[in-house]
Amino acid sequence: MADGEDIQPLVCDNGTGMVKAGFAGDDAPRAVFPSIVGRPRHTGVMVGMGQKDAYVGDEAQSKRGILTLKYPIEHGIVNNWDDMEKIWHHTFYNELRVAPEEHPVLLTEAPLNPKANREKMTQIMFETFNTPAMYVAIQAVLSLYASGRTTGIVLDSGDGVSHTVPIYEGYALPHAILRLDLAGRDLTDHLMKILTERGYSFTTTAEREIVRDMKEKLSYIALDYEQELETSKTSSSVEKSFELPDGQVITIGAERFRCPEVLFQPSMIGMENPGIHETTYNSIMKCDVDIRKDLYGNIVLSGGTTMFGGIGDRMSKEITALAPSSMKIKVVAPPERKYSVWIGGSILASLSTFQQMWIAKAEYDESGPSIVHRKCF
């Protein structure tokens, strides 16, 4: 099936914060843009300005001053299908510049995605975009494939939601999947708050983007939080400076590791949930006792919010403290983990053995949207 780009499958990973899209067989997504749709706040007064009724992605981001921005995906789950359709349209026609009716499309979904949502995705692909074939895969499973494994537990943490997903021989174990509504956006908000305490004011959505950039460039996870705090009080070794777009330079020290510490101590932002280490442990404990050893030895990190320096060592330390003392613990943090869901999709869609797994248009026409539950699991 894979003979050149004419019928190369498309892979589209729709995240809360970013859409990652491209062609199966590539080693990285061609298009990465924000999952946002913006509509003008006011009607245009300039005649012939060619105002659009909606802007998507980077264009919406850059014109955010005159737009009302909406995120059609919240906590990993689509909640606004009209806007989602606009995002897919933009992905195919503007970003990848392909005709979706000529390519099979692999979409990704959050773990525990409601059944009605999978059906809706399937329906839109076949009825709105007329794709010849499609498939829906669980994000965490794709990340595990990308790491070259079929068994393990994936901690997938993006912008809107984190999940721990135990996978055995390629199948996610739904009863043991745990969701934590704590992710990148919450960390950005927390950093905005601790910078405000220091007298810097970041409030607008535009300023939030600056803080997100600061978080991504300067934050790291301390191996021992209390000790790191002590060090930061007496020494300037953790201080780093950051230049704002207007040329002002700000210096941040302890904020660098205070921000992502929330992942391990959600109580810092008033959440009662256990941290990512405990959630991972709880997920493993919900699995059959015979497979736990395989899970402890294959803890795979995935998603943009796992990109902080020091996260692998800290995760390893925390889980070792929770697990039985004789247990061998291995935390895998692949360098490309920001895109590992997409990469896993690219690998899967280009396997020769996968070609009979696609839902073909003819099958959809015969069975309707519920076909997705029979063919994608």
From Swiss-Prot:
GO cellular component labels: chloroplast envelope; chloroplast stroma; cytoskeleton; cytosol; mitochondrion
GO molecular function, one term: hydrolase activity
Broad enzyme group: hydrolase
InterPro entries: Actin, Actin/actin-like_CS, Actin_CS, ATPase_NBD
Compartment(s) of residence: Cytoplasm, Cytoskeleton
EC number: 3.6.4.-
Chain positions with N-acetylalanine modification: A2
Keywords tagged on the record: Acetylation, ATP-binding, Cytoplasm, Cytoskeleton, Hydrolase, Nucleotide-binding
Reported tissue expression: Displays particular expression in the root cap and pericycle tissues associated with lateral root development. Little or no reproductive-gene expression is detected in vegetative organs, such as stems, leaves, sepals and petals.
Family matches, as SUPFAM superfamilies: Actin-like ATPase domain
Pfam families attached to this UniProt entry: Actin (PF00022)
Source taxon at top rank: Eukaryota
Catalysed conversion reaction: ATP + H2O = ADP + phosphate + H(+)
Broad class of where this protein is predominantly found: cytoplasm
Gene3D superfamilies (UniProt xref): 3.30.420.40, Actin, Chain A, domain 4
Extra facts: There are 8 actin genes in A.thaliana.
Family per similarity comment: Belongs to the actin family.
Subunit annotation: Polymerization of globular actin (G-actin) leads to a structural filament (F-actin) in the form of a two-stranded helix. The binding of profilin to monomeric G-actin cause the sequestration of actin into profilactin complexes, and prevents the polymerization.
Function, as annotated: Actins are highly conserved proteins that are involved in various types of cell motility and are ubiquitously expressed in all eukaryotic cells. Essential component of cell cytoskeleton; plays an important role in cytoplasmic streaming, cell shape determination, cell division, organelle movement and extension growth. This is considered as one of the reproductive actins.
Protein name: Actin-12
Organism listed in the record: Arabidopsis thaliana
